[in-house]
């Protein structure tokens, strides 16, 4: 029996991306695969554009902008498929981008989530920030990728052409078995956006599933989406959500030593923003901590539903120190 696959784009005022990139998506997606656009109450005529130009695409409209996490939850509740492919509107796909990933996931029941190779749309021989060749975190919760440490992006010279287990898959192009999505309750809607895929993958690993990288599938990501590259709101979400995913998923004995160190390191980051004359970014870090503390009762309830366990592919070190003090700028130097 053929598995039913649905490629689902969550759109918010991304008509320009849809106009530019839907043609290649339609061209390179097998006809038996459903293409769905969920719309977060866009005001740029995205829905009208789709209706006029792509009548074959299913449109699911949310009544307001619920953000990436809850927006996807509401849309995917209405999609019937065995596999969900969460695809950003600013991603260009290539020929044969679906088949190798599905083949890999079908061959191993334990693989619940998978990502393709993510390259830069503008620098096409370079890994892209949002996912590269698969995501990892260090023991303090700082995320990085094969092919991308902080702002250092590696050229793709085939060095990461091995399929392997990773810690998290990029939300820009994430393949998920629908039964696992439902088992885990989808993304955490309280995240709104940013790092929700890391939390989702960690919960999947805590539930005994695997997250994988498939280099035979290649996509190109513009990046940045609908928030500007430097945004206090983005800073707020990244700092708050990172604390939230640590609180939810770390084993109890790890929480006691990780959190004090992370609080100290966040203060260092906040003071660095002040020294760079970025007071709004400093304030965003402070607000992130305040909002996290406010949410602790809710997070405790969420934590009780997760079976925290020791999971693979967490870097047992401090990526900040390795990168800035020891000058380890590429993934291979970490010795993972």
Labelled PLM ranges:
Residues 23-32:
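Short, acidic, metal-binding catalytic loop of nucleotide-sugar glycosyltransferases
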Residues 139-145, 150-176, 198, 227-229, ...:
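A recurrent flexible, glycine/aromatic-enriched loop bordering the glycosyltransferase active site
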Residues 61-79, 89-91, 100:
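Glycine-rich, basic loop-to-helix element that forms the pyrophosphate-binding segment
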Residues 161-218:
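A short, conserved alpha-helix in the catalytic core of glycosyltransferases
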Residues 84:
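Short aromatic/hydrophobic "clamp" motif used to bind/position activated sugar donors
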């Amino acid at each position: 029996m053929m598995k039913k696959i649905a490629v689902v784009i969550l759109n918010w005022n991304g008509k320009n991306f849809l106009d530019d990139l839907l043609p290649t998506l339609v061209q390179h997606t097998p006809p038996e695969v459903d293409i769905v656009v969920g719309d977060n109450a866009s005001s740029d005529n995205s829905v009208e554009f789709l209706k006029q130009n792509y009548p074959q695409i299913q449109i699911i409209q949310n009544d307001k902008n619920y953000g990436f996490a809850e927006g996807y939850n509401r849309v995917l509740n209405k999609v019937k498929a065995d596999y969900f492919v969460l695809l950003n509107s600013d991603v260009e796909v290539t020929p044969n981008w679906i088949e190798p990933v599905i083949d890999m996931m079908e061959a191993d029941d334990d693989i619940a989530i998978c990502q393709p190779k993510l390259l830069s749309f503008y620098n096409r021989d370079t890994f892209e920030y949002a996912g590269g060749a698969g995501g990892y975190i260090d023991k303090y919760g700082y995320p990085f990728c094969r092919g991308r440490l902080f702002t250092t992006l590696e050229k793709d010279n085939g060095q990461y052409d091995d399929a392997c287990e990773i810690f998290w898959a990029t939300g820009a192009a994430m393949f998920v078995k629908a039964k696992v999505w439902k088992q885990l309750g989808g993304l955490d809607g309280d995240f709104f956006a940013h790092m929700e895929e890391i939390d989702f993958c960690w919960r999947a690993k805590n539930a005994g599933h695997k997250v994988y990288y498939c280099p035979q599938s290649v996509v190109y990501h513009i990046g940045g989406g609908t928030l500007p590259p430097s945004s206090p709101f983005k800073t707020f979400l990244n700092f708050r959500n990172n604390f939230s995913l640590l609180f939810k998923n770390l084993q109890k004995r790890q929480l006691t030593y990780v959190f004090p160190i992370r609080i100290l390191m966040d203060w260092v980051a906040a003071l660095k923003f002040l020294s760079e004359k970025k007071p709004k970014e400093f304030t965003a870090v402070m607000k992130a901590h305040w909002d996290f503390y406010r949410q602790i009762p809710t997070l405790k309830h969420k934590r009780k539903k997760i079976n925290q366990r020791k999971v693979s592919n967490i870097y047992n070190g401090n990526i900040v120190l390795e990168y800035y003090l020891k000058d380890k700028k590429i993934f291979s130097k970490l010795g993972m």
